[in-house]
């Protein structure tokens, strides 16, 4: 769980197929908090328990756990998607006991989700690159709704007379296209990312991924060759 949380952020859930159930594990005590079984049990209205009910304390050896039958997977995954908050790592099993192998089958997030769309609104994941030179912003914007394939690309620049013009144009784009997930990339630490998010009124937005480096063009060339 810690690995995936490092990659995808604090609102990451692991759903693991164990026998005929999907289960969520975690630890929530005075010393450490790992995972969100208590939070998810409340949202899904399912029972929260411990691996060994006879032991009151929960820890890595006796974790908290909550789960639901595999037959009800679509129902509960749709409910979690409705929160528009979580990146959900789905771990499935194959083989027969005792030779069970578990693997990552899918990763769902508010902006990368095709099979469990809950309404007919646009559902964009947007990537933004922000550069600043002499307090003048240059911004690149790309957004895609993976459920429809609808895509937008845009580049804008501020001016000496209006140094926040690019941010204002970006604000308009984000408001025009329903943004479920946002990736903000800047060059280095010199740009205050939180200040930008606050300006765009995304300061409290749950699904924001921050990057202080940009992937080189060679990565794009290799990916699409």
Model-inferred region functions:
Residues 1-225:
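Basic, polar low-complexity surface loops/patches
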């Amino acid at each position: 769980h810690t690995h995936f949380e490092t990659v995808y952020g604090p609102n990451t859930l692991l759903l693991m197929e164990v026998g005929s159930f999907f289960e969520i594990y975690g630890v929530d005590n005075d010393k450490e908090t790992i995972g969100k079984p208590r939070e998810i049990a409340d949202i899904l209205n399912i029972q929260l328990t411990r691996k060994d009910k006879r032991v009151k304390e929960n820890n890595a050896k006796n974790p908290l756990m909550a789960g639901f039958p595999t037959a009800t997977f679509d129902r509960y995954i749709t409910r979690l998607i409705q929160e528009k908050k979580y990146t959900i790592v789905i771990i499935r099993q194959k083989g027969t006991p005792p030779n069970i192998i578990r693997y990552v089958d899918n990763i769902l997030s508010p902006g990368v989700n095709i099979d469990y769309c809950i309404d007919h609104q646009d559902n964009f994941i947007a990537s933004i690159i922000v550069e600043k030179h002499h307090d003048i912003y240059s911004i690149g914007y790309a957004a895609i709704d993976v459920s429809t394939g609808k895509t937008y690309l845009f580049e804008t620049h501020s001016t000496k007379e209006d140094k926040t013009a690019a941010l204002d144009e970006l604000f308009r784009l984000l408001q025009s296209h329903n943004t479920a997930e946002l990736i903000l990339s800047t060059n280095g630490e010199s740009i205050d990312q939180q200040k930008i998010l606050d300006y765009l009124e995304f300061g409290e937005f749950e699904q924001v991924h921050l990057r202080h480096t940009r992937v080189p063009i060679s990565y794009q060339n290799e990916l699409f060759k």
